[in-house]
Structures are given as C-alpha cells and as structure tokens.
Amino acid sequence: MRSKPDWLKVKMPTGDTFYQMRNLMKLYKLNTVCEEAACPNVGECWNKKHATVMILGSTCTRACAFCNVATGIPDKLDPHEPQNLAKAINSLKLHHVVITSVDRDDLPDGGAGHFVECIEEIRKRDDNITIEILTPDFLNKHGAIDKIAAVAPDVYNHNVETVPRLYARIRPKARYFHSLYLLKAVKYKNPKIFTKSGIMVGLGETKEEIYQVMDDLRSADVDFITIGQYLQPTPKHAVVDRYVTPEEFDHYKYVAYSKGFLMVASGPLVRSSYHAEEDFQKLKQNRTAMLMRAESNSI
C-alpha cells in the first residue's frame, strides 16, 4: 500500500464527545459507516456529534473493490432498528441526520421499506430534524424508488462512485446508467428533494472522464456533487493509482460549479456525508438564491 501525502494525514480520534458517541452507538446496537468503512474523518465528525448511521445490518451482499464493509450472507432485519435509531438521535439532540445502508439484494425491495420505517420513526419524535439518506441502487427492484420519493427525505444521495470505464473492476455488480436513472427518477417523482451523488478519484480515471460524469449527473438533475480521494482500506482492495493534489480538487470544484451544480464539495478528505449538516444549509441557501435570480430575470 502506498504511503499517504501529508495532506491526507489525520489525527487519531479521541476526546470525550468521541467516546460518548461510540458508547451511544453501542448502547442502541447501531452500526455506523464511519467505523465500518474506516472513514478518516471519524474523529472530527464524532467530536461534532455528526455520524452516518448504517442500517439493514453490517453485512453487505456485494463486494465492491473499494469498500471496507464486510460482505457475505446478512442477518435478518432488526425490527427494533428504526426505534433504536430514533432514540439515539433524540439522545444526541441532532438537528440533521445521515442514514446509509449496506446493499441488501436478498430483500424484495432491496431495503427501501426499512429506510421508510426509519425516517417515519425519526419524524414521529421530532419532525424538525432534517434527514439525508445515502442508499444503494436497490438492484432496480419494483417499487423501491416510489417508496423513497413518497417518504421525502430532505436529501437523497446515491453515489456513482467512479467513472463508467472502471465499473467492471471497481463496482462489478452495479451499473452506472442504472445509478443515473435512480437519481433522475427520485427527482422526477419528488422535485422538492435535493439529490446528491459522489465520486472517488485516484483509481485510474482521467480528467475528461470526471467531466463526463459531471455532465451525466447534471443531465439527471443532481443538485450536489462530492469528490474525494480514494484510500485503499486493506491490501486486498483496489490499489490507489495516484493521490490527487488539493489544487486539482479545487479545479474540479470550479468546473462542477460552472456546469450548474447547486453545491460542490471537492477535496482530498471529502466523503459523502462529510460536513453534511453545514452543506445542507448552504444547499438550501444556494437554491433560494438561484430561484430569486430566475424570478428577477423573468420580470
């Protein structure tokens, strides 16, 4: 495994709030992608009481070459998970929550119904909490998209992860254009939902391929794009092709805004839910400003 440049080195997680968060997740038997995927930002985020909860168990039915989450035959769904999630959020007094999941290709709806139950349970306790969900592709199972659009999370996120040319090696069980369809369908069925997608760089893609992904996401009416450095979790995972410089990330950010995204997060340590609460507020402000400009131009 290649040594990391200085701009990717982070401090070991510590602090009272960090341990409080970890203990609370254990108390309510909740999984987090922060731990399962070995996110480099876990210390910073947990000390701010930001966490991305991972529902539908801790075992994924796929084995993507970039992901550190365990794969295999998953356990049965925990019927108490929605209630436990809502209790934990209430205990932490969160204002914005991010929910993601493993892939559950074994379930009839891919797990979409469980996302709905979690969202409804959270809103029963506090309907002022804003909710962002990061979902798998549900294997294009019937009714999954309708369920998600109907429950209306504030932000719907589904990551394309990499450029189409690398899918066979990096995401062999996924299809790039199905991911685009999923994002476009959610926006079409409920235009009020902010849509979001992310891509990793440093896997061997070219700049031109990144620009094409940006264009494809804008064609799918995606509002928010995240761009971050791929980091190899273990020697068994896909090898890092190169470390993209902070200056290149700044360039990607400039290009993405020029293509019409409402919000862009681009940097070496950017992940799907990094600074999610702050970015959601900026996203709302940017949409309001865009609508005001459009109204002004129509007068």
Curated annotation (Swiss-Prot):
Question: What positions does the domain Radical SAM core occupy?
Answer: 46-262
Localization terms from the record: Cytoplasm
**Entry-linked PROSITE patterns:** RADICAL_SAM (PS51918)
Q: Which reaction does it catalyse?
A: [[Fe-S] cluster scaffold protein carrying a second [4Fe-4S](2+) cluster] + N(6)-octanoyl-L-lysyl-[protein] + 2 oxidized [2Fe-2S]-[ferredoxin] + 2 S-adenosyl-L-methionine + 4 H(+) = [[Fe-S] cluster scaffold protein] + N(6)-[(R)-dihydrolipoyl]-L-lysyl-[protein] + 4 Fe(3+) + 2 hydrogen sulfide + 2 5'-deoxyadenosine + 2 L-methionine + 2 reduced [2Fe-2S]-[ferredoxin]
Q: How is the cofactor bound?
A: Binds 2 [4Fe-4S] clusters per subunit. One cluster is coordinated with 3 cysteines and an exchangeable S-adenosyl-L-methionine.
Which coenzyme or cofactor does it need?
[4Fe-4S] cluster
Pfam families per record = LIAS_N, Radical_SAM
Q: Which GO terms describe its cellular component?
A: cytoplasm
Question: InterPro entries in the record, alphabetically?
Answer: Aldolase_TIM, Elp3/MiaA/NifB-like_rSAM, LIAS_N, Lipoyl_synth, rSAM
Superkingdom of origin organism: Bacteria
This protein is called Lipoyl synthase
Q: In which residues is [4Fe-4S] cluster 1 bound?
A: 34, 39, 45, 273
Positions with a binding annotation for [4Fe-4S] cluster 2 = 60, 64, 67
Question: What CDD domains does UniProt report for this protein, alphabetically?
Answer: Radical_SAM (cd01335)
Its pathway, per UniProt, is:
Protein modification; protein lipoylation via endogenous pathway; protein N(6)-(lipoyl)lysine from octanoyl-[acyl-carrier-protein]: step 2/2
Q: Which family does the similarity line name? A: Belongs to the radical SAM superfamily. Lipoyl synthase family.
Q: What is the lineage of its organism?
A: Bacteria, Pseudomonadati, Pseudomonadota, Alphaproteobacteria, Rickettsiales
Q: Which SMART domains match?
A: Elp3
Main localization, broad class: cytoplasm
Q: Which Gene3D superfamilies match?
A: Aldolase class I (3.20.20.70)
Q: What's in the keyword line of the UniProt record? A: 4Fe-4S, Cytoplasm, Iron, Iron-sulfur, Metal-binding, S-adenosyl-L-methionine, Transferase
Q: Which residue ranges run through the membrane?
A: none
EC number, as in UniProt: 2.8.1.8
